[in-house]
Amino acid sequence: MSIDKISMERIAQIILPVHFRTAEPVLILGEPGIGKTEIVLKSVRSLLTEAYGGSKPKAKKSKKTFEEEMNAALAETDEAEAEEVEAKKAKKVVFNVEDYYTIIDGSGMPSESLVIPYIDNDNVDRLQRDVIPEFKKAKAFFDKKENDGKKFIIVIDELSSFTQDDQRTIMNFIQSGLLPDGTFLPNDRLWVISMGNPPRSIPGFEESDSPTHDIESAVITRCATYFVEADLKGWLAWGAQSNDKGQTNLHPYLLSALMKLPELYNVKDREDVRYLINRSGYKLSQYLYEVEKMKEEGLDAKWNQIAVNSYVGSKIGTTLASTLEQLDKLISVKELFGSDKDDKIDPKMMNKFRDLEPFERYYLLMKCLEDSSPVNYKKDNNILKLSQLVREGQLPVETGKAMAHFILENRKNKGSNASILMDNKTLMKGGDYNVAAVIMDFQDQFRGIK
């Protein structure tokens, strides 16, 4: 019987919130590059902000009509703005989530480095021990009166890179809050989350090729220990969200290609050390975005096959590149939407759109939503055309899900395309739909289908 595994998405959603309340230590083990660190840090910041930053935790969602979902979204935005105004009036101290946690990265630590020896000439025992800055930050947090009753989080990344001696120091710290310099931190208000790569000695990870130290069983037995697996669905959901540049976290080329060819994800090649996983895929995505930016600057730039291979390996790279070539030849978003003066997609262009493969239609519609899109959604005609594409474009279910998710997740970014699409009410008169309503109604038809 193999060890049970869970996705990082589910750990963030249903596991970490409970452990945060109890302050019981957590250990997360999984292959490198699957997003452990990014997802844990995002969850940590979210939990701390909800607990101490003045934001209220969201209630569990039940099935709602479109009107209920839209009203709830708008009410949530209004409430957040009202809280911001009240905070300014009261001249409250600005909450900084960075003050409430720290990260110890084992991959950057020399051996036995949790303790820093130094000479103190004023002490009888001249050789003293100090602690690393991350532990000092925790001590300083608990020394402040305004933090009474509040929790501090220590995230230990790459636990399996620590030597056995350092792991024993961590074990004592997890068990009692004992620091290497002999001082104690209040264990009931200290939450430790450790992450690492599982050694081959753990069942189910015999083929693991990540270099690690064996993790002390004393550490494992003092934590709630979870084994995680690579999760394409969760990664693509994150990839379709907008970042602070108004772009999707993953380049639409990569999102579209993996919708078409999910079998390319997390496949190791015995003849190559490179493969497509969250970390390498994200770096490839950054490369594709930079090529796109160079084109916009008028430079002669094109993505290169060998550059794609450099991130994901020759075999996967060759297959992936053929899909990217296909997307390169697509009609552009500007061609698809035409003039701002037209309130409908040109019939010939609509037929071209319908004839595209599902992943190609997905790519074009996600490019339409990005803030870098050439489409001006302050023009009602373009709202009408996007609505038409959703209703008449014969979309795959996954595309409707991704579009609805993108709009709802990014609606709070003022001035973004998502917020414009959410706020636009002009299309509702005469029984017509706001484009977000079209998407949500589309989703209602397929609710329950995965």
Language-model regions, residue ranges each:
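C-terminal regulatory/interaction module of P-loop NTP-utilizing enzymes
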Residues: 1-450
